[in-house]
């Protein structure tokens, strides 16, 4: 992936991993467009930096995605990198509720949103030099946390979708998967200070080191996520599920 001189669109750029990736890629000499639901959070990410731009987008709104894609291509015709980072995580008790609102919202934001935005931008990206799509999945794509079943399922689906996308766009668009471990962000209440989670700056430091490798790995995996990513291969899957469920 070309990590300098690119025009990069990052969804979920108002906080957490999206915010830090946007700032780091901007520091490397890229033009970065961040998208998210709240302009004030996006402006906090920019913080007066040059070559950073903000556009409001709710990835759960199909019509908004289509309009957004047309607008961003018109405003930034050099766009060559898409990072699908936006997402939500909700706890669900499958034995006590029959209201699927959280599940449906999670599927829309975490799975349909990235698929729709990728679909809306693929024709443009194929026409650009050094084009790349980065899909953010999760270590929970490979070993589920029992308390967040739909989140796990959407991230497993994003992993599979990314593999298929890589094959279909081979030679035209570079397809990369970023699978974080548990990181101290605002994804869930209290998570930004939760003991045992990877500090956000440490995660970003290690992640950017991997992005800067040439060639860029098809999967960006910090060391800490390896336990989950390779649990099934290494015969530790059941043990890993039990360990996550106990926490």
Place the predicted regions along the sequence by residue:
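Conserved mid-core segment of classical short-chain dehydrogenase/reductases
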Residues: 66, 89-104, 147-150
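C-terminal helical subdomain
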Residues: 177-178, 189-235
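The beta1-alpha1 cofactor-binding region of Rossmann-like NAD(H)/NADP(H)-dependent oxidoreductases
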Residues: 56-70, 100
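Residue(s) in the substrate-gating loop at a strand-loop-helix junction
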Residues: 138
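Conserved glycine-rich cofactor-binding loop
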Residues: 12-16
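Conserved glycine-rich Rossmann-like NAD(P)H-binding loop of the short-chain dehydrogenase/reductase
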Residues: 28-44
């Amino acid at each position: 992936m070309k990590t300098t001189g690119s025009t990069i669109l990052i969804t979920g750029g108002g906080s957490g991993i999206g915010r830090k990736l946007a700032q780091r890629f901007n520091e490397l000499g890229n033009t970065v467009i961040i998208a998210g639901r709240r302009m004030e959070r996006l402006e906090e990410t920019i913080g007066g930096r040059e070559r950073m731009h903000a556009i409001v987008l709710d990835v759960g709104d199909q019509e908004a995605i289509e309009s957004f894609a047309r607008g961003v291509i018109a405003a930034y015709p050099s766009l060559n990198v898409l990072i699908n980072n936006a997402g939500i995580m909700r706890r669900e008790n499958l034995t006590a509720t029959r209201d699927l609102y959280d599940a449906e919202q999670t599927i829309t934001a975490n799975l349909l949103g990235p698929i729709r935005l990728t679909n809306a931008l693929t024709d443009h990206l194929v026409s650009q030099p050094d084009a790349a799509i980065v899909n953010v999945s999760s270590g929970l794509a490979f070993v589920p946390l029992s308390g967040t079943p739909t989140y796990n399922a959407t991230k497993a689906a994003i992993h599979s979708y990314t593999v298929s996308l890589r094959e279909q766009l081979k030679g035209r668009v570079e397809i990369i998967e970023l699978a974080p471990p548990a990181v101290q962000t605002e994804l869930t209440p209290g998570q930004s200070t939760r003991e045992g989670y990877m500090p956000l700056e440490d995660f970003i430091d290690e992640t950017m080191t991997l992005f800067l490798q040439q060639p860029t790995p098809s999967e960006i995996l910090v060391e800490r996520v390896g336990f989950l990513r390779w649990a099934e291969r290494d015969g530790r899957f059941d043990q890993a599920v039990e360990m996550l469920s106990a926490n």
